[in-house]
């Protein structure tokens, strides 16, 4: 886990750091409108947009990811949660963050637009005997008040800022928080394997990364702390067919020609190890974590 602060005088942690003022209105003198820049980059990205049907159909496959991850542990170290906190986990998925966070806070409201993901989260809560997580089915675009989303000590949006209007999403998070807001998003290519895209003849344009978010926060008058998480991954599978099926879904709507190219690439890059098929190379996915305090 790496950490970086734009202003070295500010100290990160529960007792340090300059609090943000209330987000202001953009002025012409501010130069680049980073929300519009975000929208433009979003419109040019080549990565497929995954809707609710995608996540419902693939929930269990994505829950059983073919690699171990240090992301949640590192995020919690940055977050430094308090036992008395109520937390909103927006875009919670199957509970990658909510499940480990539950033992450190008073109550979590976990929100996602995928019923399949929420079902997996509730199953885990039952299995692990976790009784302080409540779920709400809602999206970024919904009226949060009408969905029962209120105010919370801390608000989290972890790896889920897949929105067209970033400023509006940030304002929703900010307004729902009493003390702090935490968001995380991709750095560079994020979780996307550039070599995999090139192997099937596709150009990887993952869309806007963290710098758009950070610059927009600054433009809105929010002086956010900035840290980085490096999440190492080396995917492993039971067999070649399982690997091919996984990446076929991840890349999205492959043609027959692309499927042949993908299979050839995997045959070349997968090696047998301890009864599984493992990619020869290990990748480091970097995530940017930004957080700020309410005044």
Identify what each model region corresponds to:
Residues 225-295:
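Conserved Class I S-adenosyl-L-methionine
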Residues 167-182:
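A short glycine-rich, Lys/Arg-flanked "PGG" loop and its adjoining helix->strand segment in the class I
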Residues 4-82, 84-93:
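Conserved class I S-adenosyl-L-methionine
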Residues 96-142:
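Class I SAM-dependent methyltransferase SAM/SAH-binding core
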Residues 152-167:
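A short SAM/SAH-binding and catalytic strip from SAM-dependent methyltransferases
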Residues 206-221:
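Short alpha-helix
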Residues 186-204:
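Short, glycine-/aromatic-enriched active-site segment of Class I SAM-dependent methyltransferases
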């Amino acid at each position: 886990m790496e950490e970086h602060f734009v202003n070295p005088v500010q100290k990160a942690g529960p007792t340090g750091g300059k609090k943000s003022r209330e987000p202001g209105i953009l002025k012409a003198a501010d130069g680049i409108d980073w929300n519009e820049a975000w929208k433009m980059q979003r419109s040019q990205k080549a990565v497929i947009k995954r809707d609710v049907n995608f996540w419902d159909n693939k929930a269990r496959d994505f829950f059983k990811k073919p690699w171990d991850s240090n992301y949640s542990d590192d995020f919690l170290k940055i977050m430094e949660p308090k036992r008395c906190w109520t937390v909103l986990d927006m875009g919670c998925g199957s509970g990658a963050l909510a499940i480990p966070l539950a033992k450190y806070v008073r109550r979590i409201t976990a929100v996602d637009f995928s019923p399949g993901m929420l079902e997996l989260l509730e199953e885990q809560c039952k299995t692990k005997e976790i009784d302080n997580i409540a779920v709400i089915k809602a999206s970024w675009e919904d009226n949060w008040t009408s969905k029962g989303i209120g105010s919370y000590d801390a608000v989290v949006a972890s790896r889920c800022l897949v929105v067209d209007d970033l400023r509006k999403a940030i304002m929703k998070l900010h307004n729902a928080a009493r003390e702090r807001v935490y968001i995380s998003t991709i750095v560079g290519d994020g979780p996307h394997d550039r070599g995999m895209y090139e192997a099937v003849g596709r150009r990887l344009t993952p869309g806007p990364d963290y710098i758009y978010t950070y610059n927009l926060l600054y433009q809105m008058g929010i002086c956010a702390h900035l840290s980085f998480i490096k999440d190492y991954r080396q995917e492993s599978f039971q067999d070649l067919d399982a690997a091919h099926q996984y990446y076929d879904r991840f890349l999205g709507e492959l043609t027959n020609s692309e499927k042949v190219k993908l299979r050839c690439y995997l045959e070349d890059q997968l090696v047998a190890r301890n009864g599984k098929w493992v990619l020869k190379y290990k990748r480091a996915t970097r995530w940017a974590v930004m957080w700020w305090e309410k005044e």
